[in-house]
From Swiss-Prot:
Disulfide bond positions: C707-C734, C722-C736
Protein name: Latrophilin Cirl
Main localization category: membrane
Coiled coil: none
Species annotation: Drosophila ananassae
Glycosylation sites: N143, N253, N299, N338, N395, N652, N701, N728
């Protein structure tokens, strides 16, 4: 029967007339001429100018030329000259094509066809006839699967004549199937002819033809994979236009793809057993219905074939399927492989330097179906079964039409694609010229074996070898050993004989090592698997023969070791009498590449001794395991994928026909090969077995170790005589009863050996990165919050616990992110797993301790206060980190491989150690944490049912919230870790739930980060407040964000009640804080009156520590306007003069130094007002500046006398201020649990908050400290009378005129903010005015009248300096007018300019002096009790006796006129001292009781000051009686006065006794503290008289003791220096004159400040007392000695306020420059 072509282009009987493509060559420098017959034109297929063969155009046999030389545009150049022409000539020169490889002689090669000029389309590129022809092979079974009988086997049909067809196409349907054709009786046998191009070189084949596979070629099994390919994809333009690019295998897919399955077909003749059909997954393939054919009986097989059929009857056009019948061009092994038709073998000469031919076969690769359908079923649209038998080919009426047949064939071909097989070309017949030469030499009789061996080792190490060279080399090795066995007898000398054989052995070992080297791996891949096994066996036996050649030569005990790169060979000759109990090979220092070991027992050696000697040959090989691969046991799809990567070998499973259900089992060689021999190639049986310890090369995803040896006869591994004794993850111990080459075979479970991220899809990988990044960012924010705002919290155990938890979580996240990127071969893998294990254990431990701490807090006294618990925290540190490190260390010591050999680098191996050291501790910690949480919850429920105090309820609510947060935190963290664990475990087995666990981990991990930020940062009110402060004080944010737009009094202005405008409305029903000196009853009445009169109710607001919000003119400030009259509050359009409202969350700005003890910056309380004029309309009431001199406290604390200021006619210009802003500090209780004793230890930085409230003036009693008085002359200064009695002063006109002038000048200068420079003048002026007013009213009451004091003398020196300040654009706060020294509060009257007031808000509880109005109590009693009774009486006596003045200001304002008055004062002093002593004793007892009391967080400043002396209720009643009798200030101040008086009196007595001992006769008690002993009689110099007034002493220093001790030390030091331990006096702090320069203007830039400081001379500095050592005060030279006046130095210092250790806001100066 005639054969029909599938393409339809050729007639049935025209197979021999098909146009053939021809090849033409032209050497470089010559012309290539192509000619076709008349009527035909040239159709170029491909061309190249370069060199692909070493034999073409190489007359001299040069082997150094490049054979990988190609000019890519060769075809384009030839097409421009020859396309569609009958003949053409092209010069083969670099001028035409370029020079792709300089130095190599090139040639031009062209493949073309001569086609008819009438043809309009390109014909096929190959001359071979169509492959789809009838096949007379045996029919297949009905289900498409059948038993394949190799040719010649029983049951197989006689092989038909060789056909140029595609044999072994896979069968389709069952009985009566479409292609089930009976074997024909006759077959047309056509063979493609070859023609030689005229002028072609002799011996070169004209075209690629289909040839018979050489004998011994085994294509049934794939060869080992190629680790690195030399393939490059070229010549894509030579592909047919209809061929998709995906069908052209490139360098990577020149062989079967990694997920292919190779199936062996049948057909053909001779040794060629057909084309290999491979399967490949095609996810886009449309589903096909299952076959209706019933399975036939017979043996099933995974190998299925298609009968060779005649496709021409189908009438199918080959245009669509032509591309599926060719393998694309590619480069491999220095050869260019042209496009080859499926089923053909491409044959060409070997690469340069080698002789022989190279072959490569093109086969079809079939895609694997996606589901369980039969991949060979018909199209779903075709449901009619084809008739059975051969009727389809002869009776067209009973068959499908030809179009249907072509459609069905297309459906079949769509599942195939061509590919090259095997993975690399077959170069078994290629032999290098050098090795051929060596083979000729070794066979010569007089050849030098040593020279040949040396040359062979050199060639194999430096030259490129091919598959045939491996065969030649191993053959030479065996030949050399055989010849040396005969030649050694010619050496009579034993030593010479041993030396010759040893040198030969060294060359042979080196040659074998070269063959095993990685550089020669491609040479092994040139061989088919059978040849590889044969060469490996020959190499092992050749090495063994040469080794025993040396061993037999040695006649005494000796050991010879030959060590090269890949082979360690040891020859040992042992005497039987000296054989140890066991012989071990190799030594640890001999072979560091592996820890394998062979141990031979002594009895087994004695049985194989000869002549009293035992000769043993040991060998250890590297890289031989990649050559000696095991045979196949099972096969499946996953195995094939693993095979390509890991050199595993696949085989067919005849027990199952369903390939998808075949069990996976791949056997790999998993150890190095080690050898021991007692005879030449003999498997000697031993009386006692030997012991082998072999290390596993791969420890993951392997199982079932088997001890095997290499069988020389079968060229395969065998387990006979060997058994497995024991095994672990890294080693196996075997026992064998014979000797040969040993190794370990293991089954591969899964061959995924890569990082965790390689199995993630794209979305999951991105999500994991995002999730971990979010969690890490929020954890870092939480850590920074605890670090930056640590002053907000008490240093408690809970804060430390959460800090440690965050650190552990941060380490876990980073280690996890780093670990999933590593592979198990990475050096960091083990370290990451170890540290991750430790971090997880530590984090779980800290969670347990957090729950325990909550339980401990509820069951102890710590419920009321959160204090520092350093000892307990230290135990937590020890238990958490100590236990974690100990557990990990024990785990590492027991089995280090648990960390180093794992699925991924973030998880330990799932063994007993993993569950004992990881799972168990984590579960214990978590269960304990949950248990303590439930216990804590039960206790809270019980406590909530019992009656508790308000503070306990508050604290209990806080603990309840913490427990809830920590419990949710624990559950969320458990979800994160569990999802990560199940995800990693599921990823190993590719479970369906793995993706679910992965996305659960992503979600839970993201929620964990958000939860940490929200509930541990944002939810905390203190942290929120600190966030606002932090944002406002940093310039990198816009000012609109840094400056709050809500005033502190915004809640009052809006009239929204107590919670309106406040920062936190959690507790809006708290009891309002009382101002200083106001009782609760009076406060309640005042509140009602304020609500009726429109006065704002007291409102508390927490102020921030610092702020950059400057009080400039452009900023609008809220004020009270016309609300006090009508009861309504409104916001004015313009701010009023002198009114500064502090913005909520900020503080008053100062340019002082930052406080070193403040938690979040300096608490600046010193402030300045704007100099801004505001017209006052009728009926308006507004805030004045804090005006202390014109404000009156009602005598009885009520409101009757205060109501006279409220009238319907409006508020007069001189009306006092009706509301004030009060600032006070509340501190969290600390660990002292009581009041700080004087001279006690300095505690840590106090933590609390500064509060601001607005209250009516009648409710506020101010405590200005750091005041000093001046004595002036009223005759020279008429404005003093005006200051004392402003409405009736005779100098009012002069004063108003001066003030108007100053206002105009200040408005012209446009001053933006009042300065902080000259606080001393303001302080002097303020205190002096108060004292003058006291003295005036007292004299009026007793009937006496005295002259007003004159201004201090030192002020006269600086009058011009004060005036000059106006021209520096820096207005001093208390500059004097031109007409005289103005000592008054300039903001006291409505028409006056605004002047800032510098005020310390809280009074020092130790010894600060307070000032009160004269109307409240007698002035003499004030001065007798303010600082010290005896002190001021002594001062007055000194004034009377000597007429001296105190530093420019009199303390009393006048002298005592009579001795009776002095005696009366002394009598009152003694009575007062007795009362003070009794009170002090009671206070001392009360202080002891107060140590156990807790201070409320919201205690007011008045309450704190009250508690600082004593808190006993009985003592308060007694003190109130005294206050009522003598009209004294409130009781808390009285107690302070008594304590100060006792201390000063005691110091005075001790000081006087010391003076008497020294022989002094003067009563120093009558001298002022500023006068030195001995100077009173003569009268001190005016410059020496300085008053010490209202300065607290240091440790052991009272307000007067400091001055006396200072004077004593100055006398001893010749009045040149002061004691550094003495506290500075007020006049030193604020004084002018010779004592030091005046204070500077405040708001300067740092540059201006530095420039002025550089001009100063060095000044001595002294730190303050020990309890205020964090603040620097500026001392001045003491004024006791006479100093000449000198011009003032304009040094500028800044005044700051800060909180000291006594919880007092102190005002301090900037230190002078040294």
């Amino acid at each position: 029967m005639s054969s029909i072509d599938i393409s339809g282009r050729y007639a049935l009987n025209d197979l021999e007339m098909v146009s053939k493509y021809q090849t033409a060559y032209a050497c470089e420098g010559k012309k290539l001429t192509i000619e076709c017959d008349p009527g035909d034109v040239i159709n170029l297929i491909r061309a190249n100018y370069g060199r692909f063969s070493i034999t073409i155009c190489n007359d001299h046999g040069n082997v150094e030329w490049s054979v990988n030389c190609m000019f890519p545009k060769s075809l384009t150049v030839l097409n421009s000259r020859c396309a569609h022409k009958q003949s053409c000539s092209v010069l083969a020169a670099t001028s035409m094509f370029g020079d792709p490889c300089p130095g190599t002689h090139k040639y031009l090669e062209a493949h073309y066809q001569c086609i008819s000029a009438a043809q309009t389309s390109t014909t096929t590129n190959r001359p071979s006839p169509p492959p789809w022809v009838l096949n007379n092979g045996p029919p297949i079974f009905g289900n498409g699967s059948g038993l394949i009988h190799p040719p010649g086997s029983p049951g197989a049909a006689p092989p038909p004549p060789r056909l140029p067809t595609l044999p072994g196409v896979v069968g389709i349907s069952g009985n009566g199937g479409l292609f089930n054709v009976p074997p024909p009786h006759t077959v047309t046998h056509s063979t493609p002819s070859s023609s030689t191009v005229p002028g072609r070189m002799k011996g070169v084949a004209t075209s690629t033809t289909t040839t018979k596979n050489p004998a011994g070629r085994h294509d049934g099994l794939p060869p080992p994979p190629q680790l690195h390919h030399h393939h490059t994809h070229h010549g894509e333009e030579a592909a047919p236009p209809t061929k998709p690019s995906s069908k052209l295998p490139s360098a990577g897919n020149a062989t079967a793809p990694s997920n292919t399955r190779i199936l062996t077909g049948v057909g053909g003749s001779g040794t060629d057993d057909g084309t290999l059909l491979t399967t490949k997954s095609s996810p886009n393939r449309p589903p096909v219905t299952a076959s209706n054919g019933s399975p036939a009986s017979g043996n099933n097989s995974v190998v299925r074939t298609i009968n060779n059929i005649n496709m021409n009857a189908a009438g199918m056009s080959g245009a669509d399927d032509e591309s599926k019948l060719f393998c694309g061009p590619t480069h491999a092994r220095n050869l260019f492989w042209n496009m080859t038709r499926v089923g053909d073998v491409n044959v060409q000469p070997c690469p340069g330097g080698a002789a022989g031919i190279a072959k490569w076969r093109c086969v079809l690769m079939k895609r694997l179906p996606d589901s369980g359908y039969d991949e060979y079923d018909d199209d779903p649209s075709s449901t009619t079964p084809a008739p059975s038998g051969g009727d389809c080919l002869h009776n067209s009426s009973s068959c499908d039409p030809p179009v249907s047949m072509a459609h069905k064939v297309n459906q079949r071909l769509r599942n195939f694609e061509p590919t090259w097989h095997p993975m690399t070309p077959d170069l078994t017949q290629c032999r290098s010229l050098w090795l051929n030469n060596l083979e000729l030499r070794v066979n010569q009789r007089d050849s030098s074996l040593i020279s040949i061996a040396n040359d062979m080792s050199e060639v194999t190490s430096s030259k490129t070898l091919y598959g045939g060279d491996m065969l030649v080399t191993t053959k030479i090795i065996q030949t050399v050993s055989e010849k040396m066995l005969h030649d050694k007898e010619t050496f009579p000398d034993q030593r010479q004989r041993e030396a010759m054989i040893m040198e030969l052995l060294h060359c042979v070992v080196k040659t074998g090592s070269n063959l095993l080297d990685e550089s020669q791996l491609s040479s092994w891949l040139d061989l088919n698997p059978e040849d590889q096994m044969r060469v490996a066996t020959s190499l092992l036996t050749g090495l063994e023969y040469n080794a025993f050649l040396l061993a037999d030569t040695i006649i005494r005990e000796r050991s010879v070791v030959q060590k090269v790169k890949n082979i360690l060979l040891s020859v040992r000759v042992l005497e039987t009498k000296t054989i140890p109990p066991s012989v071990i090979f190799p030594d640890s220092d001999q072979w560091p590449l592996s820890s394998d070991r062979i141990e031979l027992p002594r009895a087994a050696l004695l049985d194989n001794s000869e002549g009293g000697l035992v000769r043993i040959v040991f060998a250890a090989f590297d890289r031989l395991e990649s050559i000696l691969k095991p045979s196949y046991d099972h096969f499946d799809l996953k195995s094939s994928r693993s095979y390509v990567r890991n050199t595993a070998i696949l085989a067919n499973d005849s027990s199952d026909s369903n390939t998808g259900e075949i069990q996976q089992r791949i056997r790999i060689l998993n150890s190095k090969v080690i050898s021991a021999s007692l005879g030449k190639g003999r498997h000697i049986q031993l009386s006692q077995p030997i012991t082998l310890t072999l290390k596993h090369l791969k420890t993951e995803n392997v199982t079932n170790p088997t001890c095997v040896f290499w069988n020389y006869i079968d060229h395969a591994w065998s387990a006979n005589g060997c058994s497995l004794e024991s095994t672990n993850r890294t080693h196996s111990v075997c026992s064998c009863n014979h000797l040969t080459n040993f190794a370990i075979l293991m089954d591969v479970v899964d061959e995924h050996q890569h990082s965790l991220f390689t199995m993630f899809d794209g979305n999951m990988r991105v999500f994991i990165y995002i999730s971990i990044a979010i969690c890490v960012v929020f954890i870092v924010i939480a850590l920074l919050t605890l670090k930056l705002f640590n002053g907000v919290f008490v240093k408690s155990a809970r804060t430390t616990i959460y800090t440690s938890i965050y650190v552990c979580l941060l380490a876990i996240e980073l280690l996890f992110l780093l670990g999933i990127e590593q592979t198990e071969t990475s050096i960091f893998c083990g370290f990451i797993t170890v540290f991750l294990h430790c971090a997880i254990l530590s984090g779980a431990a800290w969670f347990c301790y957090e729950a325990f701490h909550s339980y401990y807090t509820l069951t102890s006294d710590e419920l009321l206060v959160e204090v520092d618990q350093t000892p307990k925290v230290n135990w937590y540190y020890l238990l958490s980190y100590g236990l974690s490190v100990s557990v990990v260390a024990i785990s590492v010591a027991i089995n280090p491989s648990t960390y180093t050999q794992n699925d991924y680098c973030v998880l330990m191996e799932a063994n007993i150690l993993f569950y004992a050291t990881f799972v168990a501790p984590v579960l214990i910690f978590f269960v304990a944490a949950i248990g303590y949480t439930f216990l804590s919850w039960i206790i809270m429920c019980r406590k909530s049912c019992t009656g508790l105090k308000t503070k306990e309820h508050t604290r209990l609510a806080s603990v309840r919230f913490d427990i809830r947060c920590s419990f949710v935190f624990l559950l969320l963290l458990s979800a994160v870790w569990c999802s990560a664990y199940f995800y990693l475990r599921g990823a190993k087995t590719d479970e369906d739930t793995t993706t679910i666990y992965g996305y659960c981990f992503i979600c839970f991990n993201t929620l964990l980060g958000l939860y940490i930020f929200v509930f541990h940062c944002i939810q905390n009110e203190k942290i929120r407040r600190e966030y606002r402060k932090y944002v406002r004080q940093h310039a990198w944010l816009p000012k609109c964000l840094r400056c709050s737009k809500t005033s502190i009094s915004s809640g009052i202005v809006a009239g929204g009640g107590p919670a309106a405008g406040t920062l936190c409305s959690v507790n809006t029903s708290k009891k309002p804080k009382l101002p200083l000196g106001v009782s609760e009853e009076v406060h309640g009445e005042q509140q009602q009156h304020q609500q009726a009169m429109g006065v704002p109710a007291p409102e508390d607001a927490i102020m921030g520590a610092t702020s950059d919000c400057e009080l400039n003119e452009a900023q609008q400030r809220r004020t009270l306007k016309s609300g006090l009259m009508t009861g309504t509050l409104q916001t004015p359009q313009q701010p009023l003069a002198g009114h500064v409202v502090l913005e909520r969350g900020s503080t008053l700005r100062s340019t002082g130094h930052a406080s070193p003890t403040s938690s979040a910056g300096s608490t600046h309380l010193i402030f300045a007002h704007k100099q801004q004029q505001q017209q006052q309309a009728l009926g308006e009431s507004y805030y004045h500046q804090p005006d202390y001199y014109s404000w009156k406290q009602p005598p009885q604390g009520g409101l009757k006398s205060q109501r006279e200021y409220y009238n319907n006619a409006g508020v007069a210009a001189s009306s006092p201020q009706q509301a004030h802003e009060v600032f006070y500090w509340t501190q969290k209780p600390n660990s002292q649990h009581g009041k700080k004793k004087r001279g006690g230890a300095v505690p840590a930085s106090p933590s609390g908050s500064l509060h601001s409230r607005t209250a009516a003036a009648s409710q506020v009693l101010f405590y200005p400290s750091y005041k000093k008085t001046k004595q002036g002359q009223p005759s020279g200064y008429p404005h003093y009378a005006e200051a004392l009695d402003p409405p009736h002063s005779a100098g009012a006109a002069f004063y108003q005129q001066q003030q108007q002038m100053r206002r105009q000048q200040q408005q012209q200068q446009q001053q933006q903010q009042q300065q902080l420079s000259s606080d001393e003048e303001q302080a002097e002026q303020h205190a002096h005015l108060l004292h003058l007013q006291h003295q005036q009213q007292h004299q009026r009451r007793v009937g006496g009248q005295q002259q007003l004091p004159a201004p201090p003398p030192h002020m006269a020196h600086f009058q011009q300096e004060f005036m000059q300040r106006q021209f520096r654009n820096k207005t001093s706060n208390c500059d004097l007018a031109m007409g005289g020294d103005t000592y008054h509060n300039q903001g006291s009257e409505g028409g006056a300019d605004v002047c800032p007031v510098y005020e310390e808000i809280l009074s020092n509880r130790n010894s600060d002096v307070q000032h009160y109005e004269v109307g409240d109590f007698d002035v003499d009693e004030v001065y007798n009790n303010s600082v010290g009774t005896g002190v001021f009486n002594s001062m007055r006596a000194a004034i009377t006796a000597g007429g001296s003045r105190y530093g420019g200001g009199s303390l009393s304002g006048g002298s005592v006129s009579s001795r009776s008055q002095q005696q009366q004062l002394q009598k009152q002093q003694k009575q007062q001292q007795q009362q003070q002593q009794r009170s002090a004793r009671r206070c001392t007892a009360d202080d002891d009781d107060d140590d156990d009391e807790e201070e409320d967080d919201e205690a007011t400043a008045a309450e704190q000051l009250h508690d600082s002396v004593c808190d006993d209720d009985d003592e308060e009643e007694d003190s109130d009686l005294d206050d009522d009798a003598h009209k004294l200030p409130p009781q808390s101040d009285e107690r302070m006065r008594r304590l100060m008086a006792m201390q000063d009196e005691d110091f005075k007595r001790r000081f006087q006794r010391q003076q008497r001992k020294n022989g002094a006769s003067i009563d120093y008690g009558a001298l002022p503290p500023g006068v030195a002993p001995g100077a009173g009689s003569a009268g001190p110099h005016p410059d020496h008289n300085r008053a010490v007034f209202g300065v607290s002493g240091g440790v052991g220093e009272g307000s007067m003791r400091g001055a006396y001790r200072q004077q004593q030390q100055q006398q001893q030091q010749q009045l040149n220096a002061k004691s550094p331990s003495a506290r500075l006096a007020v006049n030193e702090l604020f004084g002018h004159g010779n004592a030091g320069p005046p204070l500077p203007p405040a708001n300067q830039t740092p540059a201006q400040k530095r420039q002025q400081l550089q001009k100063l001379s060095p000044q001595s500095t002294t730190s303050s007392s020990s309890h205020t050592s964090h603040s620097n005060l500026q001392p001045h030279p003491h004024p006791l000695t006479h100093q000449h006046p000198h011009p003032p130095q304009h040094q500028q210092r800044h005044l700051s306020a800060m909180l000291d250790e006594n919880n007092t806001v102190r005002c301090y100066l900037e230190p002078l420059a040294k």
